[in-house]
């Protein structure tokens, strides 16, 4: 177990894709806390030498964070807040965008057009937590809508979207805050402000994860028969080619003044879990976690309470069926989790230590002990070569990056 960063400030890992493809560098942002989006740099640290490099530095009062890496290239995607923020337009869920840094060049991922009649392939608000698909072709994100937020904040429902490499998209620029994008961006989830209780309708889609390269799983908030929020697992199939990404379904891709952007034709949202009758219904929101498929795309892992109320890892097929309880721990899993690249185990925080469980048996192995402070719940991430696992931990008053080897010595 070794400390990797030492500077007297916070270092924030995203919950997946935080390593360069060669397993040599960890990328991070420098937000003073997860909730305060005020970092100015995206950086990386060499896990062997400790060398630190600045990948991108924001200017004009903008802030940046939540960086992830392309699976095969040193291409970084992250959130960029507004330049020259003012009272009317400053960082918010519906005022942020994805940008890609590659070989020192920076380009917009998503375009934004907030002036009716809007532009197909452009968003109308903010994108967040951008994650490349396993083959590096597509980028998933969560989304909030400026147009509906201004109309009524209750209509601005969080959704899941995908940016596909079929740009550029160039809105007319009728508003000074609009911008072009290099990718074609659409929503792939469907929400409604008032879901029918007991139905498959949802009012929030979030915490998505890739299932292979052509499907996305995510958490969707349903309502029980008595109107209680119950987070369930959903999956969507994605278009296969440029024509399909641009094909209009039953509503405009770009949305209207009254409605959110709609998914392309043929994108079907399907519910995978049905937990309303369980002793502890629903996937858990604490710890905050992103649903994650194994590398083969054959099993989706998520966190849910067992009948004793303990947060455990569960697995389900993307085709559906009954979820299988994987872990049988005596206390809660305490963090987001990830699959080892070999697909044979998952890593997370348990009993304030870094732990792995076997993907078949659920048997837990601890990789660390004697932490000064508990590891952060935000991220536990394996290196692409599978040799290391990284996390964050408060050390002398600042959040630092730490590493352990995954091999059992």
Regions found by a protein language model. Name each.
Residues 1-409:
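Sequence signature of WD/YWTD-type beta-propeller architectures
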């Amino acid at each position: 177990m070794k400390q990797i960063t030492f500077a007297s400030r916070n270092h924030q890992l995203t919950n997946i894709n935080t390593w360069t493809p060669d397993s040599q560098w960890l990328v991070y942002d420098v937000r003073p806390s997860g909730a305060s989006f005020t970092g100015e740099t995206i950086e990386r640290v060499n896990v062997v030498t400790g060398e630190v490099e600045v990948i991108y530095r924001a200017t004009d009062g903008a802030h940046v964070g939540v960086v992830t890496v392309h699976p095969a290239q040193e291409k970084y995607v992250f959130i960029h807040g507004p330049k020259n923020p003012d009272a009317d337009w400053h960082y918010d869920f519906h005022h942020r965008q994805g940008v890609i840094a590659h070989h020192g060049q920076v380009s917009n991922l998503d375009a934004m057009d907030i002036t009716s009649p809007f532009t197909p392939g452009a968003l109308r608000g903010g994108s967040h937590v951008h994650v490349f698909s396993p083959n590096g072709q597509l980028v998933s994100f969560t989304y909030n809508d400026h147009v509906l937020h201004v109309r009524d904040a209750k209509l601005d429902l969080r959704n899941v979207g995908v940016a596909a490499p079929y740009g550029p998209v160039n809105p007319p620029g009728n508003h000074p805050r609009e911008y072009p994008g290099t990718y074609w961006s659409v929503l792939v989830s469907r929400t409604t402000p008032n879901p029918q209780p007991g139905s498959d309708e949802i009012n929030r889609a979030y915490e998505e994860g890739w299932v292979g390269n052509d499907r996305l799983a995510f958490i969707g908030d349903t309502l029980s028969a008595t109107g209680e929020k119950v987070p369930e697992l959903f999956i969507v199939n994605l278009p296969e080619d440029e024509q399909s990404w641009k094909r209009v379904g039953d509503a405009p891709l770009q949305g209207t003044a009254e409605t959110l952007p709609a998914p392309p034709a043929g994108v079907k949202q399907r519910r995978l879990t049905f937990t309303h009758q369980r002793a502890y219904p629903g996937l858990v929101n604490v710890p905050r976690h992103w649903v994650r498929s194994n590398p083969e795309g054959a099993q989706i892992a998520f966190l849910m309470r067992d009948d004793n109320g303990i947060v455990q890892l569960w697995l389900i097929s993307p085709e559906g069926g009954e979820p299988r309880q994987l872990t049988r721990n005596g206390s809660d899993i305490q963090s987001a989790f990830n699959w080892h690249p070999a697909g044979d185990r998952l890593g997370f925080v348990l009993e304030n230590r870094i732990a792995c469980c076997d993907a078949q048996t659920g048997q837990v192995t601890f990789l660390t002990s004697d932490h000064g402070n508990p590891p952060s719940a935000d991220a536990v991430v394996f290196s692409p070569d599978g040799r290391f696992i990284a996390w964050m931990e408060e050390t002398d008053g600042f959040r630092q990056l730490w590493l352990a080897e995954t091999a059992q010595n």
